[in-house]
A protein has these predicted regions:
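Alpha-helical segments in soluble extracytoplasmic regions
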Residues: 53, 64-81
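N-terminal intrinsically disordered, cationic/polar leader segments
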Residues: 1-65, 99-128, 133, 137-152
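Short, charged low-complexity intrinsically disordered segments located at boundaries
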Residues: 73-83, 137-145
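Short, solvent-exposed, charged loop/turn and helix-capping segments
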Residues: 81-98
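Short, well-ordered coil↔helix boundary/capping segments
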Residues: 72, 95-102
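Short, mixed-charge, low-aromatic patches
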Residues: 61-68, 86-88
Length: 152
């Protein structure tokens, strides 16, 4: 594809991420984590049908499996979006003003794993709380006042 191109004499371009788009927003992680929280609530609210009602038990199992699968997928996406922010957007200079930044992201990534492994309303809410703090820090670094909100 690049066989006929000449790269001699060109300067090396350096970017802060894999693709230098510069488009970052913790809202992506929030949406995914909010889905995890809502699915956790739905799973906890599911009522197991009475014994002997095979059709209802099958529907219950199907719904439970679907909710768990989607919850795990959304937790992995939240983790991905958090890691992109952590490794591509935030720089060493941000640590001067936010010395707990690495710990916040590390704990958030661990919470993404925890909410995949278990059905914990506490951990799902803790993940949302951490992402809210990341949201606040992120927008402070951009000098913008962007209010936190949730879709549900």
């Amino acid at each position: 594809m690049f066989g006929n191109w000449k790269f001699e004499g060109l300067e090396i371009a350096e970017a802060h991420c894999d693709g230098p788009c510069g488009v970052y927003d913790p809202a992506q992680a929030r949406v995914e984590a909010e889905s995890v929280l809502q699915l956790t609530k739905k799973i906890l609210d599911l009522k197991k049908p009475a014994d002997g009602d095979d059709k209802a038990r099958l529907a219950y199992k199907n719904t439970l499996i679907r909710f768990v699968a989607i919850k795990e997928e959304r937790a992995e996406l939240a983790k991905h979006h958090l890691l992109v922010l952590w490794t591509d957007y935030f720089k060493p200079t941000h640590l001067e003003n936010y010395p707990d930044l690495h710990d916040l992201f590390w704990k958030s990534a661990k919470l993404c794993s925890a909410v995949k492994q278990e059905i914990s309303l506490e951990h799902a809410q803790e993940l949302m709380d951490n992402i809210k703090r990341i949201h606040e820090i992120f927008w402070e670094t951009k000098g913008k006042d962007v209010p936190w909100y949730t879709a549900s």
